[in-house]
A protein has these predicted regions:
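Glycine-rich beta-strand-to-loop/alpha-helix junction loops that act as flexible
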Residues: 206-210
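Extended, intrinsically disordered, low-complexity segments
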Residues: 246-287
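Glycine- and acidic
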Residues: 14-17, 259
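Glycine- and aromatic-enriched membrane alpha-helices
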Residues: 239, 243-244
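Alpha/beta enzyme core
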Residues: 3-11, 15, 27-52, 57-76, ...
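Conserved phosphate/anionic-ligand binding catalytic regions in large, soluble enzymes, centered on
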Residues: 22, 26
Length: 287
């Protein structure tokens, strides 16, 4: 059964581990992540960007697929279906489609407008039993054509957004989406500590989890990060395994061209990546 992300992240914060948000792009992605979460007895958040939602023909299709798959695979661990970096309009579409959690990314609005829109969406989400994440300080890199440099959030602005009653907060601390460049300065733990002081027990979210060294991940968790987003790393694993299968000529052997065979190595690679991350985040056995 799908649930909001509120309880799983409160438990993660209290237990000093993090729950992974793994973004889904299609059936194979969703199935691989759900099966791994079940095998490892880990809670999980399935993230859906607006671009991925559009690719899968719309949020209603995504919600129907995830709900049916959760049931037919016999998944018993907590699963949240979460809109990633949602626009104001996108949040309403996902609420209507049956998502259990939303993220409103108002970081590109003037702060007062971000505050007003966030307030409205918090009320709507909570009235329906959904969890809501908001963002302060844009996350760098590129995601679905949106490019940012990796700003650090203002802790006072974080407090103002947290005080609206959101369930978890994404604060920019120098993290970026996609592959990290060679000249990346690392996570700014001073900013993270200051944000934590301002927002108290609010679970914090680390976007751009791909390529952040394990020691930094563990330190971020010790400072209140309870949700870590991973997308690019699963995509890279999937692409590498699929390339290897085709370069080895396996698609030309027998019925190796059958998509169920062609996509299987990539699906297994996603499982391996998700397992590695769940072990690093400490969520194994926490369902």
């Amino acid at each position: 059964m799908l649930v909001s992300a509120t309880e799983m992240l409160k438990k993660a914060k209290a237990g000093h581990y993090a729950v992974g948000q793994f973004n889904i792009n299609n059936l194979e992605w969703t199935k691989s992540i759900l099966l791994t979460a079940q095998e490892l007895k880990s809670p999980v958040i399935l993230g859906v960007s607006e671009g991925a939602g559009k690719y899968m023909t719309g949020f209603k299709t995504v919600a129907a697929m995830v709900k049916a798959m959760d049931e037919e695979l016999g998944i018993t661990v907590p699963v949240a279906l979460h809109l990633d970096h949602g626009t104001y309009e996108g949040c309403y579409k996902c609420i209507k489609a049956g998502f259990t959690s939303i993220m409103f990314d108002g970081s590109h609005y003037p702060f007062e407008e971000n505050l007003a829109k966030s307030t409205e969406l918090v009320n709507v989400a909570h009235n329906l039993g959904l969890s809501i994440e908001c963002e302060v300080g844009s996350i760098g890199g590129e995601e679905d054509g949106v490019v940012g440099m990796g700003e650090c959030a203002d802790p006072k602005e974080c407090k103002a957004i947290a005080d609206l009653g959101i369930d978890f907060l994404a604060a920019g601390i120098g993290n970026i989406h996609g592959k990290y460049p060679a000249n990346w300065q690392g996570l700014n733990f001073e900013v993270l500590e200051n944000v934590k002081k301002e927002v108290g027990d609010m679970p914090l979210v680390l976007h751009g989890g791909t390529g952040i060294p394990a020691d930094m991940i563990k330190k971020a968790i010790s400072l209140g990060v309870a949700k870590i987003n991973v997308n690019t790393e699963c995509q890279l694993s999937f692409a590498a395994a699929t390339r290897e299968y085709i370069e080895a000529g396996k698609d030309l052997q027998g019925k190796g061209f059958d998509p169920r065979k062609l996509l299987a190595p990539g699906a297994e690679a996603i499982k391996a990546t998700v397992k590695e991350k769940m072990e690093l985040f400490g969520s194994v056995g926490k369902a």
